[in-house]
Design a protein with these regions (language model features):
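Hydrophobic, membrane-inserted alpha-helices
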Residues: 10-17, 30-36, 95-99, 159
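Glycine-rich helix-loop "coupling/hinge" segments at transmembrane-helix boundaries
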Residues: 102, 131, 176-214, 233-235
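Cytoplasmic-entry segments and transmembrane alpha-helices of multi-pass inner-membrane transporters
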Residues: 30, 38-100, 126-129
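Transmembrane alpha-helical segments of polytopic membrane transport and secretion proteins
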Residues: 7, 225-235
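Loop-to-helix entry region at the N-terminal start of transmembrane alpha-helices
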Residues: 44-60, 93-126, 160-166, 206-211
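Transmembrane alpha-helices
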Residues: 113, 117, 149-183, 205, ...
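Single conserved hydrophobic/aromatic residue that forms the stacking wall/gate
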Residues: 1-8, 12
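Short cytoplasmic-facing helical segments at TM-TM junctions of multi-pass membrane proteins
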Residues: 122-171, 195
Length: 235
């Protein structure tokens, strides 16, 4: 059927990506995990969750990476951001839903808004940390050879800080996934809605299956991003 062909095609594409980035073991787990999700009938919900996670992560990275770079190069910015990031990381996840609902109502948009804010701190912190850990003698040598600030950033600091930055990206993706599941409480949809339905309607089996799908998706995203980080480090 067309539905089966589409699902099989999506599984195949993700299997190739996983094989290339993370190796045979992760690739096999990816294809088996996605086929299990499809077999449980949660394919559409999984794709909704994945789309929300990826879109939220991209926006969080667009905002977080420049903040991390700025924080690494400005003590004043670092002093301002440090307590803000501490507050963001200690605040309970459910609290982020309140301003999201207040400004955007119910649905996917407030879910994405809450996810972006919740998932941003790791990439800001680890980008700043990675750049600060670049050896000072390397920075000074680059400057002595006439490197401009932009050349120093993009050709020296960011490449050397990339393993740490990739760890931040990995954590941002996983925090996005955890928040997307919680955001089902404000009608964000996806796998979180299945888990929430299982809890509220006492359908233990349904909630357990939804939880398994979330875990599979989390492991796939974690291993692929870790594989990408190792590949960059090897280069």
């Amino acid at each position: 059927t067309p539905l089966y062909s589409s699902a099989a095609s999506d599984v195949y594409k993700r299997q190739i990506l996983a094989w290339y980035k993370s190796g045979k073991g992760v690739s096999i787990f990816t294809i088996l995990g996605l086929l299990l999700i499809w077999g449980m009938g949660f394919w559409n919900e999984t794709m909704q969750t994945l789309a929300l996670v990826l879109s939220s992560t991209i926006i969080a990275l667009i905002m977080g990476l420049p903040l991390g770079i700025w924080s690494a190069n400005s003590k004043r910015c670092d002093k301002i951001l440090h307590p803000i990031l501490d507050l963001m990381q200690t605040m309970p996840a459910f609290v982020y839903l309140i301003p999201a609902v207040l400004f955007f109502g119910l649905g996917t948009v407030p879910g994405a808004f809450a996810t972006i804010i919740f998932a941003m701190p790791p990439v800001v912190r680890l980008t700043s940390l990675g750049i600060k850990q670049v050896p000072k003698n390397v920075v000074e040598a680059s400057r002595s050879f006439g490197a401009t600030p932009m050349q120093l950033l993009f050709k020296v600091q960011l490449p050397l800080a990339l393993p740490t930055i990739m760890t931040g990206i990995n954590q941002t993706i996983l925090m996005s996934l955890s928040m997307v599941v919680i955001a089902a409480m404000i009608a964000a949809g996806g796998l979180g809605e299945i888990v929430l339905k299982g809890i509220t309607q006492m359908k233990i089996g349904l909630g357990f299956e939804g939880g398994i799908a979330v875990v599979i998706l989390a492991i796939i995203l974690d291993r692929i991003t870790q594989g990408l980080g190792k590949q960059k480090k090897g280069k």
